[in-house]
């Protein structure tokens, strides 16, 4: 009878996750996970055939942690803003996990930034429709455009450090959300990407000149 494993599968995954949190997915090797646990590499391969299996479990753990942030944001009085702020906090507090989920080309089409965006979109659609009085199509367009803003800010956080304070980024999210909401409500063709650019800018600039 083989000796009883000293560590559980979950403890091995957690050790690998801690490595990913500080040094990234590429740092997860059998030797480094074993060192984190203070054992030889043998216990790892009691549960896993390859280290790629370990990395897949770490990816799933990172997704769960991200999902917890989104769920927390949805409890905010303004759910969409709450989700945006939690997204930025995730990038700020878990930069390596953010890189894994959103800045690394996925091997699986069901993973990566676009898949995460669609999943989050499904989570917040109802609250956007309710809060901003939008149809599902309008809410999805609002979410897509705001996601691009949040993703850009989060990427700056991860790649350039503390470029903006959380208060500054919260204000940016508010400003962009107001602009996008107004465009959806007032700009003909915005939702369908069929804006008459010249006519719309003439209208905007005409209003501006008329107000001076």
Per-range role (PLM):
Residues 20, 52-62, 101, 105, ...:
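Alpha-helical DNA-contacting segments of helix-turn-helix folds
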């Amino acid at each position: 009878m083989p000796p009883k494993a000293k560590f559980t599968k979950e403890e091995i995954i957690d050790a690998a996750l801690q490595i990913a949190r500080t040094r990234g997915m590429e740092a997860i090797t059998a030797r480094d996970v074993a060192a984190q646990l203070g054992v030889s590499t043998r216990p790892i391969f009691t549960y896993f055939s390859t280290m790629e299996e370990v990395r897949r479990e770490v990816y799933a753990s990172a997704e769960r942690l991200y999902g917890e942030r989104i769920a927390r944001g949805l409890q905010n009085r303004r759910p969409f803003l709450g989700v945006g702020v939690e997204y930025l906090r995730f990038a700020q507090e878990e930069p390596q996990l953010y890189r894994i989920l959103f800045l690394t080309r996925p091997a699986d089409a069901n993973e990566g930034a676009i898949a995460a965006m669609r999943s989050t979109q499904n989570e917040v659609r109802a609250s956007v429709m309710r809060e901003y009085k939008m149809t599902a199509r309008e809410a999805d367009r609002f979410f897509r455009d705001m996601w691009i803003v949040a993703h850009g800010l989060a990427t700056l956080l991860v790649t350039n450090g503390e470029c903006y304070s959380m208060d500054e980024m919260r204000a940016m999210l508010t400003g962009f959300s107001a602009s996008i909401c107004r465009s959806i409500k007032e700009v003909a063709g915005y939702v369908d990407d069929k804006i008459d650019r010249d006519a719309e800018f003439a209208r905007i600039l005409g209003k501006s000149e008329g107000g001076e």
